Amino acid sequence: STRAVMYGPVNRADYQSLLFRGNCISTSTTFIETELLRSVNGFDESTEIVTAEDYDLWMRLAATKPTTVFIPEILGEFHRLSNSASSAVLRNLSSEKAVLRKHFAEQSASVLTRLRQRHRFAIADYGAARQLTSQPVQALKLFASSIRLSPFVFKIYPAVLILIFNSLIRRKKL
């Protein structure tokens, strides 16, 4: 399937937003000054963050407070093959969480920060669950994890109901 995504806006590209709200930067349409890229040692090629190394790089770059500009146009597209979607989603979730743990280790240990961290992990699980709705059992496990981590992410609840409803309809058709 093909999906069009508009990245940005620029006010979402600062370090705290990238950390607590997620990635809003596309690798395929990004230009970075060589010296800036070198100053943060480029991509981290650690195996635990493969598929999310760009997200890690954006956060390390954002920590330097560079000038960031977004072009308000769709500049590329990507294709997801359904036969590999599940393993890719779960691998990306694992990598995203590894990046988050890496950057959270540098944050304060205040109660508010820990709550925000739990919320961010919940959003990661929620996002993966939304991508796995064709596999209701796996999606429900991720939605449940998301609710356990941060029960006040209210958008989870309608997503769970829709998943259950659609699963019941699919079952009746069989």
Task: Identify the meaning behind each predicted range.
Residues 68, 74-174:
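C-terminal subregions of glycosyltransferases and related glycan-biosynthesis enzymes
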Residues 2-91:
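Conserved nucleotide-sugar donor-binding catalytic segment
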